[in-house]
């Protein structure tokens, strides 16, 4: 052996380690991995110099990585920070453990210290408590929803018939109609009101396709036409030949039919009145005939009485004129009653029969 080789062999390992640590650290080539892009491999500013890490024996590094890797026998959860050998508890080894070798080693390196483990435990407990709260809230909401849910009302055929009849008559029944339906069908009024709401929605959905066109019949132009007794289009009237209920707009046609009937009745009324007028005239004439006769007789009596009064007035006027004409007329008038008295005295007494004489006696 040469002298240089012997000196190298005689030197202790500690000196060689110190020399190696005192030298510059070899540059690592960084790839374009996820950790490098996200900056997970950046070292904190308070970390120890990397020169001491490079001086650690490669066997120790392999042992630590084999223990921390998923394929290894143990793990940090099983061994814990106190379960590793004593030389692994040095600060240089802790920095090696904190160096992220892969993605799955990063959270384990952060939880290396006892303080970190306590923090993670507290965060886990908080997560569990928050999840429990969420579960309890969701359970309460579900129970509330279940309580609010109502059972579906099952209608009998009789009830449906009565409700459909009422719906054909009026889509919006008033309070009195709802009360009558409640008495007939033995249903509460709120159920009847809900049924009418659902039935109107169903009717609107069906009537949107009415006439294969645009507008609903009840609230559109055709409803106004019916209200003002304007004739409907022929396409609508033709659909009513098979029956109003089988047509495209049963409620509209029913309303149109009612308006036509009302118009026909209003047209018949003047004709009936005209026909009834001559009959009434005849009846009135017959009834007024005795009244007219009585009125005529009364008029005749009045006329007769007036004529008699006039005759008496003329007689009185002639008498007055006679008295005014001269005293001769007065003397004549005075002589006349004397003559009459004389004539009565000069008349011969009539012969009385014996029974009359007896009666006089």
UniProtKB/Swiss-Prot annotation:
GO cellular component: cytoplasm; nucleus
Keywords (A to Z) from UniProt: Activator, Developmental protein, DNA-binding, Homeobox, Nucleus, Repressor, Sensory transduction, Transcription, Transcription regulation, Vision
Membrane spanning residue stretches: none
Location of the DNA-binding region in this protein: 148-207
Disruption phenotype: RNAi-mediated knockdown in the retina of newborn mice results in an increase in the number of photoreceptor cells as a result of a decrease in the number of bipolar cells and a comparable increase in rod cells at postnatal day 21.
InterPro entries: CVC, HD, Homeobox_CS, Homeodomain-like_sf, OAR_dom, VSX_homeobox_regulators
Motif (OAR): 304-317
One protein family per Pfam: OAR
Localization annotation: Nucleus
PANTHER family: VISUAL SYSTEM HOMEOBOX 2 (PTHR46892:SF1)
Protein purpose: Acts as a transcriptional regulator through binding to DNA at the consensus sequence 5'-[TC]TAATT[AG][AG]-3' upstream of gene promoters. Plays a significant role in the specification and morphogenesis of the sensory retina. May play a role in specification of V2a interneurons during spinal cord development. Mediates differentiation of V2a interneurons by repression of motor neuron gene transcription, via competitively binding to response elements that are activated by the ISL1-LHX3 complex, such as VSX1 and MNX1.
Disease: Defects in Vsx2 are the cause of ocular retardation (OR(J)), a mouse disease characterized by microphthalmia, progressive destruction of the retina, and absence of the optic nerve. The OR(J) mutation is due to an OCHR (STOP) mutation.
Quaternary organization: Interacts with MITF.
Protein name: Visual system homeobox 2
Taxonomic classification: Eukaryota, Metazoa, Chordata, Craniata, Vertebrata
Gene name of this polypeptide: Vsx2
């Amino acid at each position: 052996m040469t002298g240089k080789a012997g000196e190298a062999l005689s030197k202790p390992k500690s000196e060689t380690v110190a020399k190696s640590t005192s030298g510059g650290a070899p540059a690592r080539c960084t790839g374009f991995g996820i950790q490098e892009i996200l900056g997970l491999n950046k070292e904190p500013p308070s970390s120890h110099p990397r020169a001491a890490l490079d001086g650690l024996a490669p066997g120790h590094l392999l042992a630590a990585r084999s223990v921390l890797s998923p394929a290894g026998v143990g793990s940090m959860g099983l061994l814990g920070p106190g379960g590793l050998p004593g030389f692994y508890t040095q600060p240089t080894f802790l920095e090696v453990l904190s160096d992220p070798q892969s993605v799955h080693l990063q959270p384990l390196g952060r939880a290396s210290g006892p303080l970190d483990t306590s923090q993670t435990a507290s965060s886990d407990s908080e997560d569990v408590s928050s999840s429990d709260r969420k579960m309890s809230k969701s359970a309460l909401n579900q129970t509330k929803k279940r309580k609010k849910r109502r059972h579906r009302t099952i209608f009998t055929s009789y009830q449906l018939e009565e409700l459909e009849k009422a719906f054909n008559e009026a889509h919006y029944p008033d309070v009195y109609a709802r009360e009558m339906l409640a008495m007939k069908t033995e249903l509460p009024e709120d159920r009847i009101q809900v049924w009418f709401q659902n039935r109107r929605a169903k009717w609107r959905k069906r009537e949107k396709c009415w006439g294969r066109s645009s507008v609903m019949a009840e609230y559109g132009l055709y409803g106004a036409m019916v209200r003002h007794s304007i004739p409907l289009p022929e396409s609508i009237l033709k659909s009513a030949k098979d029956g109003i209920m089988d047509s495209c707009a049963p409620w509209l046609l029913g309303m149109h039919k009612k308006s036509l009937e009302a118009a026909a009745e209003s047209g018949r009324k003047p004709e009936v009145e005209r026909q009834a007028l001559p009959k009434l005239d005849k009846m009135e004439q017959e009834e007024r005939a005795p009244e007219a006769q009585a009125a005529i007789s009364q008029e005749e009596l009045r006329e007769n009485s007036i004529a008699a009064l006039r005759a008496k007035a003329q007689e009185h006027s002639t008498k007055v004129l006679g008295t005014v004409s001269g005293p001769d007329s007065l003397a004549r008038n005075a002589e006349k009653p004397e003559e009459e008295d004389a004539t009565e005295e000069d008349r011969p007494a009539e012969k009385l029969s014996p029974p009359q004489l007896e009666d006089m006696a």
